[in-house]
Amino acid sequence: LYMNTLTVPGVLLAALLAWTLLSHGEVTARAFPPLMKVFGSYTKMAVDRGVFWGDIVSSLTSAGIGFALGFLFGVPVAFLMAWYRPVRNIIEPWIQFIRNIPPLAYVPLVVIAVGVGRVPQVIVIWIATFLTMTITIYQGVRNVDETLIKAARVLGAKDSDLFIKVIFPATTPFILTAVRLGSSVALTTLI
């Protein structure tokens, strides 16, 4: 614990020192402006013009909407893929193909299709989060212990009971993992 409490400030201090040294070099001064100049620009943007916080809110709104859409579409698609083989046979090859393409590769296509603004941001974030969350939740549903499903069937559980009382609770850790991964992907794609 003691080592960790010193490590973080030490690393930050070393990074600031390296930045300061690099900002005084002839070649590196353009890539690393002095710290005080950076903080001055931040102050000007945040306080004087007030654009900094507005831009942060706008960006996080885009990420939040894209994430929410990815979650709302990803959960049912994942459950349908895991539960019904015909659905899986149709959707899974497409998801496996599309998920290997970096989300940023969609930007030109989306901009051509819908124009510039918040909508293309949301669409690209939605695609990225949808794919990540769908695969994660799908794996969770597929990994539900078969013994639990058989036991519920023997006890007379209908499909709706099976879903609500067995599959959904057993898949909850995967859903939470999908939320964590999806939020990371949303913010990474936003940047």
Protein language model features and the residues they cover:
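Transmembrane alpha-helical segments of polytopic membrane transport and secretion proteins
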Residues: 1-13
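Short helix-capping/hinge motifs at transmembrane helix termini and TM-loop junctions
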Residues: 23, 27, 81-86, 114-116, ...
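Periplasmic/extracellular loop-to-transmembrane helix junction in inner-membrane transport proteins
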Residues: 24-68
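Hydrophobic alpha-helical elements at and bordering transmembrane segments
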Residues: 52, 56, 60, 90-97, ...
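Transmembrane-helix boundary motif in ABC transporter permease subunits
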Residues: 65-95
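Generic hydrophobic transmembrane alpha-helix motif, especially the helices
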Residues: 96-132, 139-140
